[in-house]
Amino acid sequence: MINLIITLIINTALSTIIVLIAFWLPQLYLYLEKSSPYECGFDPLGSARLPFSMKFFLIAITFLLFDLEIALLLPLPWAMQLPTPNLTLILAYCLIILLTAGLAYEWIQKGLEWSE
């Protein structure tokens, strides 16, 4: 028991020391290049409040939803090996139907067209 306590104290102390060093070390060496913002090779001269296309935002959110669908359906082959995979299949089909209905709605509302 005493070994566990000593190990926890040493780990906590080392973690605290490393975090403190990480906060103090960058403040010792301030360079103009490090203190200025970097925007993909361009100097930020204009305003940061530039308008963006709402169509681009909606298409990005749609792709994000379908990436989430893939992440949710990836464990499906392992779930099919359960003794009773009926509930898993029903939930997977419900998810696919819900996302297909959402995609059809976006398509009908012309939300996927890029022209403005």
Swiss-Prot record:
Its EC number is 7.1.1.2. GO terms for cellular component: mitochondrial inner membrane; NADH dehydrogenase complex. It catalyses: a ubiquinone + NADH + 5 H(+)(in) = a ubiquinol + NAD(+) + 4 H(+)(out). It is a multi-pass membrane protein. Coiled coil: none annotated. The chain crosses the membrane at residues 4-24, 56-76, 88-108. Pfam families: Oxidored_q4. GO terms for biological process: mitochondrial electron transport, NADH to ubiquinone. InterPro entries: NADH_UbQ/plastoQ_OxRdtase_su3 (IPR000440), NDAH_ubi_oxred_su3_sf (IPR038430). It is found in: Mitochondrion inner membrane. Keywords: Electron transport, Membrane, Mitochondrion, Mitochondrion inner membrane, NAD, Respiratory chain, Translocase, Transmembrane, Transmembrane helix, Transport, Ubiquinone. It is an enzyme of class 7 (translocase). GO terms for molecular function: NADH dehydrogenase (ubiquinone) activity. Core subunit of respiratory chain NADH dehydrogenase (Complex I) which is composed of 45 different subunits. Interacts with TMEM186. Interacts with TMEM242. Belongs to the complex I subunit 3 family. Core subunit of the mitochondrial membrane respiratory chain NADH dehydrogenase (Complex I) which catalyzes electron transfer from NADH through the respiratory chain, using ubiquinone as an electron acceptor. Essential for the catalytic activity of complex I. This is NADH-ubiquinone oxidoreductase chain 3. It comes from Osphranter robustus (Wallaroo). The gene is MT-ND3.
